[in-house]
Swiss-Prot record:
Free-text comment on the cofactor: Binds 2 magnesium ions per tetramer.
Binding site for L-phenylalanine: 340, 423, 448
Binding-site residues, Mg(2+): 425
Principal location: cytoplasm
Source species of the chain: Methanococcus vannielii (strain ATCC 35089 / DSM 1224 / JCM 13029 / OCM 148 / SB)
A biological-process GO annotation: phenylalanyl-tRNA aminoacylation
Cofactors required: Mg(2+)
The protein, known as: Phenylalanine--tRNA ligase alpha subunit
Enzyme Commission designation: 6.1.1.20
Length: 501
């Protein structure tokens, strides 16, 4: 194995010193400082070396801190003024005569906080002019002993106060040591020969004939290099982009709707009763302003009739929910709790002629639930849903489409089990199999109930399904906590693989 000259120089330091661990200073005799880390990184990639990093935190006095040690804290200046002038009190309004403008307010606040003074009729009275100040003493100590590790928990609390006052700042220093491995020790048992190398054959080398004498370093495409993290899209954005591409390739068109919806569109049109638990404040975000919205009057009458008695004009669809429907509730505004509202609005917009055609649409967007934040719940997340409206589609078609969709997302093993949703019948849940995790629920689906479709004058079956994209992202990225998707952890974002199937 041929090593770079810088790698050889670094290993020679271990050979000559017979040490297993050497710090950066110990290598300077053999290799230039700016080349140490590059050579060490290469040797680490060859398993010849380990890099040991130790991070230390050191405190540093700011200009304010240095002035405080030389001239005293602002509160000490006040007490010294009283001692010098043999006064027992001092008017608050005259603080600016003793202190700088930016010191006066802080001095008074700290005198009261430290319980060194009492305030009477606008005058400051010191309990004792000969007082001890822990902050002053600690600041002097820090000027002599800056290593943070040398301080107790109580002292660190005081240090935090000194930092807030602008007297101190914290610096982090990384110290590195280099440890040779067993493989590296085997290598240095042999003589280490360092030849003059050239990386580029120049005209002068050719003309002079020196190219015959020098060692030309071979180009090694496999040599370890520093990792580079180029700019890339957020993993959640890539998931959304991928799902959009999959659905578009399957013949779906994308539709959108507003974030703020009336309860009519969000709940009533989906045949969800007005006393359903999902519609209370524990699950839904109600909008304060505007708190009501416009509802299409004729459609409202039809939906109301469906809810109350299951009828559209004289046509009996079902029993309905058998309760008194409140039109004012329908007008209240909410943050949408699902993207199905986009499909419902799309269906309601179809003309009689358009209802005769074949329709495949989907929506990917943010939805909102009044959830308690934990490892699997957020109040805001992305959802994807879609519908297919056609004359002869059936439950079997729905299962086939879902399996194709999940297969294109990389899930080969899919199983279907029965489920219940208020606005579809029959309904199903699809589970996918993941190695090491078993079967996991991923999406819900079904066929829209007649009570949902009849108010729009739609007689054809409509297949519907929905999937939480945050759940999909967790499975694909191997996350156990949904909050990790939105932490903006730069290290995680840099190292996360842009989605692979």
């Amino acid at each position: 194995m041929e090593l770079h000259n810088d790698e050889k120089r670094l290993l020679k330091a271990f050979k000559d010193s017979a040490k297993n661990i050497i710090d950066s200073e110990g290598l300077l005799e053999y290799i230039e400082k700016e080349k140490i880390m590059r050579a060490a990184f290469w040797l680490t990639g060859r398993d010849f070396l380990n890099i040991i990093e130790k991070k230390s935190k050191f405190l540093e006095l700011t200009e304010l801190g240095k002035n405080a040690i030389e001239s005293g804290f602002p509160e000490r200046k006040v007490s010294n003024y009283l001692k010098t002038n043999k006064l027992d009190s001092f008017p608050i309004k005259d603080l600016s005569k003793v202190l700088e403008k930016d010191e006066a307010g802080a001095a008074l606040g700290n005198l009261k906080k430290k319980e060194l003074v009492t305030i009477e009729k606008g005058n400051i009275f010191f309990k004792s002019l000969e007082y001890k100040d822990l902050e002053e003493e600690l600041l002097k100590k820090v000027s002599l002993y800056p290593n943070l590790e040398e301080y107790s928990k109580e002292e660190i609390l005081t240090i935090e106060t000194l930092k807030k006052r602008g007297f101190l700042k914290l610096n982090e220093v990384t110290e590195r040591e280099f440890e040779i491995t067993v493989k590296g020790l085997e290598y240095i048992k042999n003589p280490i020969e360092i030849k003059e190398e050239v990386t580029q054959i120049t005209r002068d080398l050719i003309v002079s004939g020196k190219w015959k004498e020098v060692s030309i370093r071979p180009y090694d495409a496999k040599i370890p290099t520093e990792e580079i993290y180029p700019a890339k899209a957020h993993p959640m954005s890539k998931i959304i982009e991928e799902v959009t591409e999959v659905l578009t390739s399957m013949g779906f068109s994308e539709v959108k709707s507003q974030i703020v919806q009336t309860e009519f569109w969000n709940f009533d049109t989906l045949f969800e009763p007005q006393d359903h638990p999902a519609r209370d404040m524990q699950d839904t975000f109600f909008v304060k302003y505007p708190d009501t919205g416009i509802v299409p009057h004729e459609l409202l009458k039809k939906v109301k009739s469906i809810h109350e008695c299951g009828k559209i004009e004289n046509e009996k669809i079902s029993k309905g929910w058998c309760y008194k429907f409140d039109e004012e509730v329908s007008k209240r505004t909410v943050l949408r709790t699902h993207t199905t509202v986009s499909s419902i609005k799309y269906l309601s917009s179809l003309s009689n002629e358009e209802k005769e055609n074949f329709h495949k649409v989907f929506c990917i967007d943010r939805v909102f639930r009044n959830e308690t934040i934990d490892y699997k719940h957020l109040p805001e997340f992305y959802q994807c849903e879609g519908i297919i409206m056609a004359e002869d589609v059936s439950f079997n078609n729905l299962v086939g489409i879902l399996k194709e969709f999940l297969s294109k997302l990389g899930f080969e093993k899919v199983r279907i089990r029965p489920a219940y949703f208020p606005f579809t019948e029959p309904s199903l849940e699809a589970e996918v199999y993941m190695e090491g995790k078993g079967w996991l629920e991923l999406l819900g689906a079904g066929i829209f109930r007649p009570e949902v479709l009849e108010p729009f004058g739609i007689k054809k079956p409509v297949l519907a399904w929905g999937i939480g994209l945050s759940r999909l992202a967790m499975l694909r990225l191997g996350l156990t906590d949904i909050r990790e998707l939105h932490k903006n952890d730069i290290e995680w974002l840099k190292k996360t693989v842009v989605i692979e199937k």
